[in-house]
Design a protein with these regions (language model features):
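Conserved catalytic-core surface of thiol
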Residues: 98-143
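Signature for HUH/AEP ssDNA processing cores
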Residues: 1-76, 85-87, 124-171
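Helical (often loop-to-helix) elements that flank the catalytic cores of nucleotide-handling enzymes
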Residues: 83-105
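Structured loops at beta-to-helix junctions and adjacent beta-edge loops in soluble globular domains
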Residues: 42, 51, 84, 102-104, ...
């Protein structure tokens, strides 16, 4: 396919630039391949991975408190949040489906290509000077998002307590 090699070269340069930027800000990464970066968790940061519905709830709470943190999204429908390392996942979140704390392992970091598509930033770390959110802040927001039923009608961040009907509400 004409142009494919030039595309791969440009994308490879983008991945290498992202790796340098992560490393310059103390985020440990390794190149898994020419188009995949792995963020190493457990020392400088851990990563909380949640389903997108919970991620929208977390973002809504953070937005309401005017807090900006990095957020990545995967093509399989999960979002992840870099958090301060060393905290254990609270019991309520350990029991929640598809909530995973990555500590001491590796996770594909933007702009990585994975089998189902691309991992990308919803909020890039540069938007908050590569700050890592306090684990307890994100865990608390995640616990609240799990406890609330997230609106599935296409309104990102819209949420309401289970059993409450929202009429004419817009987030």
């Amino acid at each position: 396919m004409p142009g494919w090699d030039s595309y791969r070269a440009v994308y490879g340069a983008e991945v290498r630039a992202a790796a340098r930027e992560f490393l310059d800000h103390g985020w440990p990464v390794v190149e898994k391949s020419a188009d995949t970066l792995m963020l190493i968790t457990g020392s400088a940061l851990d990563v909380l991975e949640v389903p997108a519905a919970i991620g929208r709830g977390i973002c809504a709470q953070l937005r309401a408190a005017d807090i900006v943190v990095p957020v990545a999204a995967t093509p399989t429908g999960s979002w992840w949040y870099p958090v301060t390392p060393g905290s254990a996942l609270p019991a309520g979140l350990r029991e929640a489906e598809d909530v995973v704390l990555h500590a001491g392992d590796a996770i594909a970091a933007p702009p990585s290509q994975v089998p189902d598509g691309w991992v990308h930033w919803r909020v890039p770390p540069a938007a908050c000077d590569f700050g890592v959110a306090a684990a307890d802040l994100i865990f608390s927001a995640a616990a609240t998002a799990v406890a609330l039923r997230v609106d599935d009608d296409g309104h990102p961040g819209a949420q309401r307590p289970a059993g409450v009907v929202a009429v004419g509400m817009r987030s």
